[in-house]
Amino acid sequence: MTIFVRIKQKPLPMKRILIAAVTLAIAFAPATLAQRPGGPRPGAKPDTEKKDEPEKPAPELKVTAGLFGVAQHEKDWYFDIPDSLLGRRILAVTRFVKHTPGASEYGGEMVSNRMIYWEKAINGNLLLRIDPNVIHSEEGDEIDLAVKASSENPIVASLKPEKTASPGCTRVKVTSLFEGDNQPFSLSAASKRSYNLGGLKGDASFIQSIRTYPINTEVTTTKTFTYNAPTPSAPGPAARGNTLPAGTQAGVVTLVLNTSMILLPEKPMQPRWFDPRVGYFADGYTEFSDEQQAVERIRFITRWRLEARPEDVEKQKRGELVEPIKPIVYYIDPATPKQWRPYLIAGVNDWQKAFEQAGWKNAIRAEEWPEDNPDMSMEDARFSVIRYLASSTANAYGPNVHDPRSGEILESHIGWYHNVMTLVHDWYQVQVGAVDPRARKMKYDDELMGDLIRFVSSHEVGHTLGLRHNMGSSSFTPVEKLRDKEWVEKHGHTVSIMDYARFNYVAQPEDGIGKDGLYPRINTYDKWAIEYGYKPTDFKTPKEDHLYWNKVIIDRLNAQPELWFGGEGSDSDPRAQREDSATTPSRPATTAS
C-alpha cells in the first residue's frame, strides 16, 4: 500500500526570489542586449590602454660598400651581408687599441682571434657562429654523420633581419653585437678574471667607428668594465690578479678595442704537413674517415703564402730567383724612436738571403709606417707591424695570425718592449765585455745598441715566419773554433739565429775576433728551415708533398748533421740547452781560460 504524505513547505522570502530572477535574466540575455550602445564589445581592452601605433618608415641609409656593407643611422649601425658570404669563413682578430695603465698588456697587442661565419636560421634570423675547426671528416663517409652530430658550432648572436635590405643580401642591426660583451669582440672570461673586471657598463661602452674595405671590416669600440679591487689578505684569484690604478681610483676600467674581420680564402692554401725534424710552429685538427683503423691527427706548419706569377713559374723551376706576387711586408710602428728604426728594418731584410735558398727574390722587407695614409690602420689585420710598446718588460716576442684550416700566415704584430735594450745591454756586457771595449759602458752608443736591436729583430721575425727556437744549433760548433778568428767570423758561433746562444763568450782579447764572430746571424739552419717551409712544389695533395720532403730531409741531415733541430722541450738532451755554446757545453769555460 502506498502512503502519500504531504509535506508542508515554508514559503521563500521575496528577496531571494528577486535575486534568482535577475541572475537568470542576465545569464540568458542575448549578446546584442548585453552590449551597451556605443560601448566596447565584450572582451575588448579598456579605452585607457595605448592603441598600436603605425610602424615607422625605415630610415634611408647611406651604405658604404666593402666586405660587409656598413651604414649608420643616429646611434645604430647596420651590416649588409651578401648571400654569397653565408657560410664563408672569416677571421675576427681583436686587438687592444688603448689599454689601462698598470696592465701587463699594451695597446697594439692581440686579445683574441676566432674563425666566424654567418648562417640563415630556420626562423629567418641571421646567425653568427664560431668554427673551432677541431674535427674533420669527408663528405659522403658514413662516419661523417657521427662527426656532424659531435661538432655543433656555437651561436654567438641571432640577429633579426631588417626589411630594407637590397636583393641578395641581409641587413641586420649590429649595435648591440659590438657594444655588448660578446666574447669574440671583447675580453674572455679568463682575461677579465685576471684583471679583476666585473660586468660591462653599457652607458660607458660604445662603438667609435666602423670602416669597411673589400676583404675586411674594422670595428673600433670603447668598453668600460666595473672593477673588483683585489683584497691582499683574501685568498683566491682576485687576490692574485693585477692591481690596476684606474680601477682602484675610479672603480671602473676603460679599454679601446679593434676587431678586424678579414675574409679567408674560399679555397684554403694547400698545407705543408708538419715534420718534427724541422722546427716550425704547427696547427691542425682530428681527421675521421671510413677507411681508418686509427684516428689521425693532421698537423701542418704555419707559413706565409708565396706565389710566383704565371710567367715566372718555369723560371723558378729552372733555379732562377723570382719575386712573389705578394711579398711579406712589415711596417715599423711610428711610436718607435727614430734612431732604432733602420736597425729594426735591417733585421727584417736580413731574411731575404734565406728566402733565396727557397727560390725567392725580395720575398720580405720592412718599411716605415706611411703616416699620411688614412686608409691604413695598425690594428687592421691586412698589415704586419713591429709594435713599439711602452713597457718596463725586458723582452720582445714574435707571434702570427694564421688561417686555422691551412696554416697560412695572414699577418703578424711583433711586440717590441722598450726595455728590451736593458736585456741586450747586459748580455753583451757580461759575455763580450772582455773583447769589445764598447761593451764596458753603462750606456751604449747608437751603433752598438742598433746592432743588438737588429739581432733581436731578426730572431723575432723568424718566429713570425713560423720558426721555433732551435736550442740545438750551437751544439754543432767545434769548441776550438770559437777562438779561431778566420773560422768563426766566416761561419758564426751558432748555425741558427733561432738559438738561445746569444754571443760568443769564449772569445778572448788576444784572438782579435770582430763582431762577425761575436754576434749571432741568420745562418745555415735558418736557410734550410726557410727552404723546407717556402720552396714550392707541384704536388696535388699534402700527402704527396710530405713524402717528397721526407726524402729531402733524410738526405739533407745525412749530408749536413748541423741542420739537426733541437727545440723547446728537449731539455733532457744535452745538445739542446739554453745559453750554451759549442759541441761540448762543459768545455768553453776551459777553452776561454
Predicted segments, located by residue:
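The catalytic-center signature of Zn2+-dependent metalloproteases
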Residues: 43-45, 368-389, 451-458, 462-508
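Conserved catalytic/binding loops enriched for acidic/polar residues
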Residues: 474-593
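Sec-exported extracytoplasmic/periplasmic mature domains
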Residues: 349-360, 462-463, 467, 503
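Sec/Tat signal peptide C-region and signal peptidase I cleavage site
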Residues: 28-34
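Extended catalytic-interface subdomain
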Residues: 397, 402, 408-416, 457-465, ...
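Bacterial N-terminal signal peptides
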Residues: 21-28
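Bacterial N-terminal signal peptides that target proteins for export
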Residues: 7-20
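Auxiliary tRNA-acceptor-end handling modules of aminoacyl-tRNA synthetases
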Residues: 36-336, 354, 358, 363, ...
